[in-house]
Each structure stands twice: as structure tokens, then as C-alpha cells.
Amino acid sequence: MLPQYFWSVPRCAGGFLRRCIVPCAVFSLVTGASAQGGQTFDTVEVQGAEFIPEHDIQMTCGAVAGVPYLTIELRAIEDCLMSTGVFETVKLIPNGETLVIAVKEVNTRPGRIEASLSYASQDGLIGGLFFERYNLLPDTYGSVRLEYNPEVKRGSGRLYRTDVLGSDIDLGVKLGWEELSFDDSSYSKETKQIETYLAWMPSQKTRVEMGVGYRDYRLFDVDDGASALLVSEQTAGISAPFLRFALKHSSLSEGENGWGTWDYSVGIDQYFWNLGTDDSLSDFRFESRSYVPLGQMWRMLVSLDAGRVSSLDGNNATRVIDRFAPGAGSFRGFAPRGVGPHDNGDALGGNTFAVSSIEIQGNFEGLVNAPLVGGVFVDTGASWALDDTLGRAIDDGFHRRSSVGLSLAFEVGRAPVSLFVAKPFDKQDGDKEQVFGLRLSTAF
């Protein structure tokens, strides 16, 4: 639940009605408080209010002009305002003919701005800037993230409001922009996207989302010597609406990490891209994680990631910017975007992919008094199938790749670090290896 605004605070009701100033003021008028030293003010002024309307602060506990107040009654107003829970401090200060209500509000709009520097084998070294704030809009969380290096440029924004429809349905809006131009690719791509979605959590462990949005994306700057398939797939842009459906379920409760218990998580995403055009696509993605305990400090992690993209009407072909090309962190031991059909040295990706992993992990935090997880793993998978093989000139068949390696995850200060060393033992001609992989991030 996001923090609530001041106007959601109950007004002078129930038990603390006796502390509100209205009955106190009436009592003073009836008994002639002014004759006993009460002071009347011509005006009431609020100081220090940032987000709460000054009129609300005055009237919530009955601080009004023209009414005589004893000192004890001014203290009662302070107690009444403090009891609302939205102020850190409240002080009523007589200043001549003006009663000053000096307040300091509790921060109901917590947020942060941070710069970051991160490295991932997939994207390289990236500088970032992140901003988030709760109640950026009334009862609405908002965030903005920017990332940049010469090959990767990204920007994203998000608005999220809970309990839009009853107490179960939330509303979100996502905006995104990305331009990628990697040195190891013969092309560049750009995507602009906006989506509005509803989220429903039938339980604390299950989440369902349904979204509708609009996307514009393009494939450009294809090298002259690139694969003829890439040249034919070049496009100045496809702009069209899309639909998204998602289901996430996890046996893990918030704060649990999968050690010492048998747990799992599963996620399904279904996209329908480019609706209303000749390039309409179905894009299905699946992921699962299973944690099998091998004692309190050891476990087996079994994972599967898979996906398939295909034409909705069976007539149009996918493009490289639609297809899957796992590698680096998503398929350890192989270079980024490297697994799948190739032509003329270019990675083309496949319409279908699947990567599974079995990893034995040990938790060594108790030995070194710091977060430390080490493991040994075997990854295996493939990416295959094209709509156009240039007259069977391109081999798009299923060819399994496999690798074995060691992984390590720890923290340096507050910066998480994960790395692996892997060696492919089942590969195809033309595959590029990546023996060492690293991911780290630090914020300041």
C-alpha cells in the first residue's frame, strides 16, 4: 500500500474528540474564558506546510480566528494535530494578533535520486541515473531510469497506483526507449514503447497482469557486407498497438531466499505485437526456477528459460529484432547474442529458444561473515528456426550447445557482484565463446 495523503486521516472522531479544540472553544465561550486570561486572535497563519492544504490544518482541530484560547487549549490543539500522524512537530505560537501554527510534515513522499555505474557481459560498462518517489502524483509511485554507453542507450519511466478498482486491482503505466548498436553486430535497432496495464494479485504469491500499449521499432544501419537476410529485414519502422498478458507465481514469500526449503517460481508472458499490420506477431516466453534443498547450506537450482515468436497469420516473416539469441549471462560460456543460426558471420537469432541450467550452490556466508554464494553449473540449450533461410542456404536446425563452469556471488561494500568461469563442451562451428562473465553495480 502506498503512503496515504493527509485527507485520509480521520477527523476528530472517537477517543481523541476530547482533545479537539472545537468543544474546548465552546466551553471557553460558555464559561467566559477571555475573562480568565484567554487570548483572541484576528488571524490564524500556518507555517511549514508543503503538501497539506493550510485550510485543512487550521480546521482539522478547530484553530479559528475570533475565539479566545487559554494556553492549555493551544496545547490541546497541538496534541490533536500530532495525533493525526502526519506531522513530525507542531507548535502554536501567539504573535501579537496572529496565531501561528508552525508544522513540520512527515515525509509522505519518500524518494531518492542516485547515479550508478554497472558492468554486465551483455552490455558492457554503463552509467546510469535513477529517480523514484512515492506519491509523485496522489497515491501514485513514479520512477525514471536512464542508462548510457556508446553502444547502449536506454530510458524508462513508470507510474503505479494501487487499489484502483477495489482493493485488488492496481494500475500501471510504463514508457521505454532503447537504442542498441553493438560492435559485434552488423545492424542497429531502436524501440519506443508505452503501455498501460492492470495488475491483480489473487494471493501474495501470484500476480496476473494485462496490458495494452503502442510500440514503434526499427532495424537500421545494416552493414553493406552483412547477411542478405539482415539486409532484407531492414525497416524504417513499424508502429502498431500490442497486447500483453502475464502470470507470475512463486512459492517464496517476501524476504525468503530459497535456502533450506523446497521452493519454486514460474512466469509466463504472452505478447501480441504489431496488431492491425502485415507484421503481426505472437511472442511467448516462459521461465521457471526450482530450489531443491541439499541441507541447510546447500541447494540445487534448476532453471528453464524458453520462448517462441511466430507470425499471427502465417504469412509474414520475423526479423532479427524479433528473434531470440541467448548468450553471456543468459547462456554462460557463449558470447553475447551468439547462440543460434548464423550467416556470413552474423548472428541471426532463432524463432524458438530454450536454455536450461542445473547448478549446485553453497551458501558460505556463515564462514566469512559476509554474503557469499558459490556454485558449479551445467548449462544447455539452443536457438533455432527461421521463416526465411534464403533457399536453405542458412542452417536453422536445432543444434544443442552446452557448457560447464563455476559461479560466485558476493558483495563489495554495498555493491553486488556476480561472476562465472565457463567452458563450452558442446558447440557449433562459428560459435563465439566467453570464458569469463561479470556483473556488478554500484550506486552513489
Predicted region positions:
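N-terminal secretory signal peptides that target proteins for export/translocation
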Residues: 1-15
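Short strand->helix junction
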Residues: 11, 67, 273-275, 425-427
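Bacterial N-terminal signal peptides
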Residues: 19-31
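Periplasmic polypeptide-binding modules associated with outer-membrane biogenesis and secretion
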Residues: 35-118, 130, 145-163, 192, ...
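Gram-negative/organellar outer-membrane beta-barrel architecture
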Residues: 102-254, 262, 329-339, 351, ...
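C-terminal outer-membrane beta-barrel translocator/porin domains of Gram-negative envelope proteins
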Residues: 115, 243-372, 376-387, 391-393, ...
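A short alpha/beta connector and helix-capping loop motif
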Residues: 390-407
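Extended hydrophobic
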Residues: 411
